[in-house]
Design a protein with these regions (language model features):
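Periplasmic-binding protein-like
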Residues: 97-120
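An extracytoplasmic/periplasmic, membrane-proximal ligand-sensing/linker region
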Residues: 115-158
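A bilobed periplasmic-binding-protein/Venus flytrap-type ligand-binding module shared by bacterial periplasmic
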Residues: 75-87, 106
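Short helix-loop capping/hinge motifs at secondary-structure junctions, enriched
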Residues: 1-3, 85-91
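Extracellular/periplasmic catalytic domains that process cell-envelope and extracellular macromolecules
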Residues: 31-32, 58-60, 72-74, 86-89
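Ligand-binding pocket segment of bilobal, Venus flytrap-like solute-binding proteins
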Residues: 1-66
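Solvent-exposed, polar/charged alpha-helical surfaces in well-ordered, non-transmembrane soluble domains
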Residues: 9, 24, 28, 32, ...
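Solvent-exposed loop/turn segments at secondary-structure junctions
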Residues: 43-46, 71-73, 86, 100-101
Length: 158
């Protein structure tokens, strides 16, 4: 935890602005020169680059470059069927559809999030190049979440 505490303190001390309410204003701040770097979910930049957020944001997004840490953390979107489901068969069919080539391709194109591996990707995403995904399980991240939040609070993260 000592190295983690040092990293958190360094992040807090290096903030050019208070923590932003979401990733879009943070990306705008980088594009406008208020910040030199930001850690953001990539799909926010994808929406801006595709013009989903309007022409002003599309223009601003052209001033931002994606750099992948090595390795990079990857958020996942998941689904499941609980024992309490009143219609587990339909719920299972929905999950199967959502993981199909058709749904994943549409989701990537509409939202600029990475689809399941091997399914057609959005041109915006392809332009950013490959990345090396961190080999940490979602289960392990969940196990460490409370400790991480405690370390953040104890070291000035707000």
């Amino acid at each position: 935890p000592a190295a983690t505490e040092d990293w958190i303190k360094g992040m807090v001390n290096n903030l050019a602005e208070p923590v932003f309410s979401s990733d879009t204003p943070m990306i705008r701040a980088v594009a406008q020169g208020q910040c030199g770097v930001a850690l953001a979910n990539s799909y926010y930049l994808g929406r801006m680059q595709a013009g989903d957020k309007g022409e002003a944001d599309k223009t601003l997004s052209g001033k931002v470059t994606v750099r992948w840490p090595d390795p990079v953390h990857v958020n996942i979107t998941g689904g499941g069927v609980t024992r309490a489901s009143r219609n587990p068969e339909a719920a299972q069919r929905l999950l199967e559809f959502l993981s199909s080539d058709q749904a994943q391709g549409g989701y990537a194109a509409a939202n600029h999030e990475y689809p399941l591996k091997g399914i057609g990707e959005d041109p915006v995403l392809q332009a950013w190049g490959p990345f090396n995904q961190a080999k940490v399980s979602a289960e392990r991240l969940g196990e460490l979440n409370a400790q991480a939040l405690e370390l953040m609070a104890a070291n000035g993260w707000q």
